[in-house]
């Protein structure tokens, strides 16, 4: 329509407006292509993805391999335990001991444990009330480790630093995983102690013990100094006492009768926490150590050696209480076999055939030597 109007106005010779401009499709530049939707992945990104995939694959294989290797020894151990039940039982006992005494403490060396003095319970001299008299059987005492009452033929090991004594096997088991006293947590050696040559210093030793009162508060007990007399070492023993009226602050001891358990040695005493306390007796108990029983001195009598190496009695006295006490077999691992206990006791007791110069110098042994020289 515009072209017709332009033609008419051109014939009349009157141009009202210039003719429209038309672009030549041949001379016009080509239009840019529309952007494509699918861009190509960069080779660098593709390389990184491949590397990560390979790393994840290798780590997965290593994880599966480690899990297989961990499970395989356990299966082998179970099959071995089925073939050898005795070995599996001993391994189970060792695991129980490690779990019970799983502490940062690595325990003591066996040579140090063997150097501690050993005596029979019937050899204790003194009375629990602080007066005179021979024999500690006037008042029964209990072992703080196994909770059993001491009998006359029981062998006890003394910790000279704190004067506490326990059953031979009980304290040996404890010291294999701990280096402190199980009762007062006191150290068994002074600063500068050498495991290879055990040396105890009794000159300036003081013991601080804290006792828990009936209402739960703690009070510091009287500090006592350990004095090494002529061939005599002090012994501090205690027993479990039951407090009936804990809330009123009045403690009443329950009379406990002792009975011998020969049929079932695995029976143990267990107490309700909070109703029983292990109370040390205010006693003047002492143990005389003859020259032939000290590892540092030469033996003079062979009869004492036979007495020291004699097997201890296996029957344990178990106290029975009217109420609040029950028997348990949860600590049967503490009880050794008869043959094992006798062999360990004979192995750990000092023998008279030992060479004097090869044994460690202990302070109570040096005290004997000084006293003998002064007497001469």
From Swiss-Prot:
Q: What is this protein called?
A: RING-H2 finger protein ATL46
EC number annotated for this UniProt entry: 2.3.2.27
> Annotated pathway, please?
Protein modification; protein ubiquitination
Q: Which gene encodes it?
A: ATL46
Q: Which GO terms describe its molecular function?
A: transferase activity; zinc ion binding
CDD domains membership: RING-H2_EL5-like
Comment on protein domains: The RING-type zinc finger domain mediates binding to an E2 ubiquitin-conjugating enzyme.
Question: Keywords on this record?
Answer: Membrane, Metal-binding, Transferase, Transmembrane, Transmembrane helix, Ubl conjugation pathway, Zinc, Zinc-finger
Q: Where is the composition biased (Basic and acidic residues)?
A: 296-305, 358-376
- The residues forming a coiled coil are none
Please list where the region (Disordered) is annotated. 296-320, 341-376
Query: What reaction is this protein's catalytic activity?
Result: S-ubiquitinyl-[E2 ubiquitin-conjugating enzyme]-L-cysteine + [acceptor protein]-L-lysine = [E2 ubiquitin-conjugating enzyme]-L-cysteine + N(6)-ubiquitinyl-[acceptor protein]-L-lysine
């Amino acid at each position: 329509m515009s072209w017709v109007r332009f033609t008419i106005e051109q014939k009349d010779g009157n141009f009202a407006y210039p003719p429209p401009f038309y672009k030549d499709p041949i001379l016009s530049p080509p239009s840019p292509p529309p952007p494509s939707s699918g861009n190509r992945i960069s080779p660098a990104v593709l390389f990184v993805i491949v590397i990560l995939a390979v790393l994840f694959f290798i780590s997965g294989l290593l994880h599966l391999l480690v899990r297989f290797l961990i499970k395989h020894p356990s299966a082998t151990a179970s099959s071995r335990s089925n073939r050898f039940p005795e070995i599996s039982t001993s391994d189970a006992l060792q695991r129980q001991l490690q779990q019970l005494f799983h502490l940062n403490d690595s325990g003591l060396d066996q040579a140090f444990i063997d150097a501690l003095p050993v005596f029979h319970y019937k050899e204790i001299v003194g009375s629990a009330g602080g007066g005179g008299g021979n024999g500690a059987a006037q008042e029964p005492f209990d072992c703080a480790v196994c909770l059993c009452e001491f009998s006359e033929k029981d062998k006890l090991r003394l910790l000279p630093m704190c004067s506490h004594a326990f059953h031979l096997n009980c304290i040996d088991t404890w010291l294999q995983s701990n280096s402190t006293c199980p009762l007062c947590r006191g150290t068994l050696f002074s600063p500068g102690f050498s495991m290879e040559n055990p040396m105890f210093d009794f000159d300036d030793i003081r013991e601080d013990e804290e006792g828990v009162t009936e209402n739960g508060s703690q009070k510091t007990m009287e500090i006592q100094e350990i004095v090494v007399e002529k061939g005599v070492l002090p012994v501090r023993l205690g027993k479990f006492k039951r407090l009936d009226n804990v809330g009123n602050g009045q403690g009443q001891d329950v009379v406990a009768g002792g009975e011998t358990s020969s049929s079932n040695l695995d029976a143990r005493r267990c107490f309700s926490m909070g109703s029983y306390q292990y109370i040390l007796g205010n006693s003047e108990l002492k143990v005389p150590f003859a020259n032939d029983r000290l590892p540092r001195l030469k033996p003079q009598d062979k009869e004492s050696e036979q007495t020291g190496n004699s097997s201890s009695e296996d029957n344990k006295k178990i106290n029975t209480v009217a109420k609040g006490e029950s028997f348990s077999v949860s600590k049967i691992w503490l009880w050794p076999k008869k043959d094992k206990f006798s062999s360990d006791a004979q192995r750990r007791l000092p023998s008279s055939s030992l060479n004097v110069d090869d044994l460690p110098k202990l302070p109570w042994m040096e005290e004997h030597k000084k006293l003998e020289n002064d007497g001469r």
